[in-house]
Structures are given as structure tokens and as C-alpha cells.
């Protein structure tokens, strides 16, 4: 590393420190109804079926996609 690198980095981060970043005022309420085990199971299963199953099928058949016949 060069001798000037710390000076350059300090000058770049110095201007960023002066910027005002607005903070979000986020407040949450408790859930209206608690989710049961069945609801969570159905949600995770549907995510698996919709997202991971097609991706797994494509990855398992990748060799057949590479062949040009």
C-alpha cells in the first residue's frame, strides 16, 4: 500500500460523515393473530415448491441442456 492511501481514504470518508441521513420512524404493532404450526408449514412448503423445486429440476437436467442434437 502506498503512503497516500490512508490520506486518500480519510478524505473520501470525511465528506461522507458530514451527510445527514434521515432515520425512519418505524413502529410495529403486535400481530392481530398468531400463526400456527400448520400455517407456517403450508407457507414454507409452498415456497419450496414454487422456488426451489423448478431450480433443482433445471440443475439436475443441466447435462441434457448442454447437448446439441
Swiss-Prot record:
Residues 1-25 form a transit peptide. InterPro entries: Cyt_c_oxidase_su8 (IPR003205), Cyt_c_oxidase_su8_sf (IPR036548). It is a single-pass membrane protein. The keyword Ubl conjugation applies. Residues 61-69 are mitochondrial intermembrane. One of its GO terms (biological process) is mitochondrial electron transport, cytochrome c to oxygen. A motif (SIFI-degron) lies at residues 2-19. It is found in: Mitochondrion inner membrane. The chain crosses the membrane at residues 37-60. Keywords: Membrane, Mitochondrion, Mitochondrion inner membrane, Transit peptide, Transmembrane, Transmembrane helix, Ubl conjugation. Pathway: Energy metabolism; oxidative phosphorylation. Residues 26-36 are mitochondrial matrix. It comes from the Eukaryota. One of its GO terms (cellular component) is respiratory chain complex IV. The keyword Transmembrane helix applies. In response to mitochondrial stress, the precursor protein is ubiquitinated by the SIFI complex in the cytoplasm before mitochondrial import, leading to its degradation. Within the SIFI complex, UBR4 initiates ubiquitin chain that are further elongated or branched by KCMF1. Gene3D superfamilies: Cytochrome c oxidase, subunit 8. Component of the cytochrome c oxidase (complex IV, CIV), a multisubunit enzyme composed of 14 subunits. The complex is composed of a catalytic core of 3 subunits MT-CO1, MT-CO2 and MT-CO3, encoded in the mitochondrial DNA, and 11 supernumerary subunits COX4I, COX5A, COX5B, COX6A, COX6B, COX6C, COX7A, COX7B, COX7C, COX8 and NDUFA4, which are encoded in the nuclear genome. Belongs to the cytochrome c oxidase VIII family. Component of the cytochrome c oxidase, the last enzyme in the mitochondrial electron transport chain which drives oxidative phosphorylation. The respiratory chain contains 3 multisubunit complexes succinate dehydrogenase (complex II, CII), ubiquinol-cytochrome c oxidoreductase (cytochrome b-c1 complex, complex III, CIII) and cytochrome c oxidase (complex IV, CIV), that cooperate to transfer electrons derived from NADH and succinate to molecular oxygen, creating an electrochemical gradient over the inner membrane that drives transmembrane transport and the ATP synthase. This is Cytochrome c oxidase subunit 8A, mitochondrial. The lineage of its organism: Eukaryota, Metazoa, Chordata, Craniata, Vertebrata. The gene is Cox8a.
